[in-house]
Amino acid sequence: PSVQGAAAQLTADVKKDLRDSWKVIGSDKKGNGVALMTTLFADNQETIGYFKRLGNVSQGMANDKLRGHSITLMYALQNFIDQLDNTDDLVCVVEKFAVNHITRKISAAEFGKINGPIKKVLASKNFGDKYANAWAKLVAVVQAAL
């Protein structure tokens, strides 16, 4: 699907679920960002190869570069949430975000591996499958840009 087409799948209910869960997840960008990244690495060890510049990712919060990447990731998600009501603007920021991943030759399928860690981080905050499915739809918008 096109990026526009994927963005069109973000219904009012999906947007509400994204916003409701983001209120909690986004309130601790550093902690939840590091949790997201360390879960990605634990569950998909082959993804560590894309992040060589981060050094020893098993250090978690003690790794400055991992913390920095995690915080940057969370602000990108904040940007996506902020643009949910304007599809054209959402597409613009998603395409900008995608450039960094295209440069690193991260495919849509590889990028989709973030869905599992998102589901786990959401579950740790008592957000179930409905919320994980909403985030998977947002991830699909990024995947369409890759």
Curated annotation (Swiss-Prot):
Belongs to the globin family. It is found in: Cytoplasm. The keyword Iron applies. Homodimer. Heme b binds at residue 101. PANTHER family: BLR2807 PROTEIN (PTHR46458), GEO09476P1 (PTHR46458:SF1). Its main location: cytoplasm. Keywords: Cytoplasm, Heme, Iron, Metal-binding, Oxygen transport, Transport. One of its GO terms (cellular component) is cytoplasm. This is Globin-1. CDD domains: Mb-like (cd01040). Coiled coil: none annotated.
